Amino acid sequence: MSRTIFCTFLQREADGQDFQLYPGELGKRIYNEISKEAWAQWQHKQTMLINEKKLSMMNPEHRKLLEQEMVQFLFEGKDVHIEGYTPPEKQ
């Protein structure tokens, strides 16, 4: 049975995560406030960031940058800016 939460990203009720996907206090916040749908949107943006900026998850500075982008995207309403990328609907 899935959990329903109020997703702060989508601003509506949605299916919550099945388990905590990220460590620490931030992970608890994501588990309690971010839906599966919003997390999937973040994963798409995260993949683009890693690829376009050539980030390495072995590099602590790159992981910190990615975490900052994640917080801004999920909780502060700031879209991820990827230089040179234009979404298909805006071309």
UniProtKB/Swiss-Prot annotation:
A Pfam family annotated for this UniProt entry: Iron_traffic
Signal peptide: none
Keyword terms: Iron
GO MF entries: iron ion binding
GO CC entries: cytosol
UniProt record, GO biological process: cellular response to oxidative stress
Record bears the keyword Transport: no
Lineage: superkingdom: Bacteria
Oligomeric and partner information: Monomer.
Purpose: Could be a mediator in iron transactions between iron acquisition and iron-requiring processes, such as synthesis and/or repair of Fe-S clusters in biosynthetic enzymes.
NCBIfam families, A to Z: PRK05408.1 (NF003817)
Family listed: Belongs to the Fe(2+)-trafficking protein family.
Protein name according to UniProt: Probable Fe(2+)-trafficking protein
